[in-house]
Amino acid sequence: MLGRLLRTSSLSEFVPFGSSNVTVGEEVFQNEPFYMTDDLKTLLYGTRDKALFERIANDRLHNGGFRLIISQELGHVTSRNNYQVVLDHSSVNFHTGAHIPLNELKDYIFGSSIRTIDYSASSDKIKVVKSANIVLFTRIFYLNEKSTLRIAISCCVTDDVLPVLTECWPHISSFLDQCENTLLKYLAKNDTQFLPHDWKARNCIEVAAVLQTFQRKIIPLLSGYSDTPRLFLYPMDSIPYIKTWVKYVTNWIELKDGPRVRFLPILLAKLRYDFASLLKENSNTRIVILTGNMNVANRLIFILTAFLGPHFRGTLHKSINSQGCPSPAGRKMSNMSGASDFPFELKPSNSSITETNKGWEIPRIKRDPTFSVTSVSSDETGVQTFIQPSSLKSGASSVQYLSSSLNSAYGSYGSWFKKVAQSPSSRSNESSHEVPPILHRNSSSTSFHQQAVLGNINGSQRVTPQPSPTIAEYEEYPWFSPSPIARDQPRPEKRIPTPISSYTTEKERRTHLQSEIYDVDMKRTVNRLIDEDSLNDAFADLVIDPPSYDTTVSNEKHGEIVEVNMASPRKQRNNQNQELLRRFTSYTPHYNQWFQLQACQITTESENKVIHSMKRDLTYADQDPCKKDKSTSTLLISLRSREIKQVTIVRDTNNRFIQRTKKILQNGKVGPVSRAMLSGIETTDQHLKKLMECNNDNEALVSLFNDIVTCAST
């Protein structure tokens, strides 16, 4: 009951997207910050770069910001006032480096006064204005074949959308077609060539309809594509990745499924034999995980990505820990709280430790005043006058952790449970005497704290300051491994990279290989990889080492011809190394209809939102002549009820939607599936057992892994 109350109250904290000046439609996706541990960030996104996730949480473009301009030509070619602006609307939350005057924007929009031959055709163009950090995309069209006057619909957005603008351009072009038809209908109905200058006074609802299309459809579409972080799929031949994947599969089967429930084998068999290939062929196909447990959903997504593609085939970039080497007393460490970059210096201390057997008591030994903790706005005495438990078996440092956590607010670093794991009392007595404590500053928004941290925590063990997860995150199907709340010991990913040859035993070598994945730090943005190596190789092929070619001598029929062998082996580049990542993401608080793989909060309306987005896909497909999609499918996975079902919607000849639901797993039993699928489930189960038992031979491990994740159609 408590978990449900917490989960319900947390939903009210999210502010609707673009609520400052628009009424939000169904297409809106809200991208809100959420808690995720550093190891999951590395597994899902290939990096734990703090700047990437801070941008996701705080610096979102989109907040619905845009500037819409509708303008037209008046037919006065020689006049300076040849262009008239019908609408110039800027949303309140549209912030750019410089406000571009309308005169300059009109030059960008209409450009040269030279006309095209075909006046009936509309044209689109994209302009990047680097000085203002904006992107301007424009639709220019004519009233009819006889008219020579151009009408333009232009939109300014921040340049953050540039990587995905061409990706989602088919959808944007469809919406621009709607806007164009709306204005053309107004001109035809009123038998005029010009839009009204004061459209509000003339009650021109068509202009308002165009503005509403941008507010409710085009801008949320760009936001859904560009604001959501996309998953990084590790290479299929990476031994650390395979070992980590096997570890997660083993934990799921042993701790969550148990000996009777075969939830994971059935789900993986469905992907392997049926849905993975469908997801690759049809962009309208989705996998949606409905859950109230973010951590379990993210672990399941990591498991499912092995069956999806394309996987990265380049070089994995490893993080460099320059501060990992220990040094004698006097070494420097960076501030873990991130409040200041000024390093504190370690010096030996003569502070003593009191241990009693009388439970809670007032310490009678005078402490070093250096380790007292007081509030900035208080004149009270230090921490040596506080009551402390003898079970903590440490000096003032443990009480400092307790005091700091009790006084900290949302902006503070971590929670009390997290600080207990960091405090010297949670470690062995031997380690507490080896290195003296060190003072650190906390970046709390309400108070100033000094935390006593053991010196053996180096600067490379810094984690992203994040709020602690709520109880609701561990309520549903509890994960029995130590939670990130209760542990903060040095993880494998935070160690100094050590050569494999330095390990003496096979067990140490396997442990090192498995932990290598946590050292990955790929250069990336929210939706793209920064693959400089592939770019340099392509440049070298074209410029530094150009391909060989033959020249055909000119004659009376043709000029000189350069013949390039396009079938050259060097030109057969691997298309898997694409910068733009696929639309797969992890847990998001709200459903994003534009992504193919995601997990979202389960509510009473979750399934209805998914079905409604599927119907919209078919509607958009009818408007786009290039698309021939007549059906769309979604694999719905409910972790709360452990149900798996495939929802398919088709459109018949009468344009009616027909929905079919195929239950794969319900109430712990396999649904009415084909014999081939039943055989596939048994085969997948056997492959998983062999994979879990194979730990010594890396070649056999890679072979078994590739066998199980290779998609095979039934």
From Swiss-Prot:
Keyword Protein transport set for record: yes
Domain dDENN FNIP1/2-type stretches: 634-712
InterPro entries linked: DENN_FNIP1/2, LST4_longin
One GO BP: protein transport
Cellular component terms per the entry's GO annotation: cytoplasm
Pfam families: Longin_2
Function: Involved in extracellular amino acid uptake. Required for the protein trafficking from the Golgi to the plasma membrane.
Protein name in the entry: Protein LST4
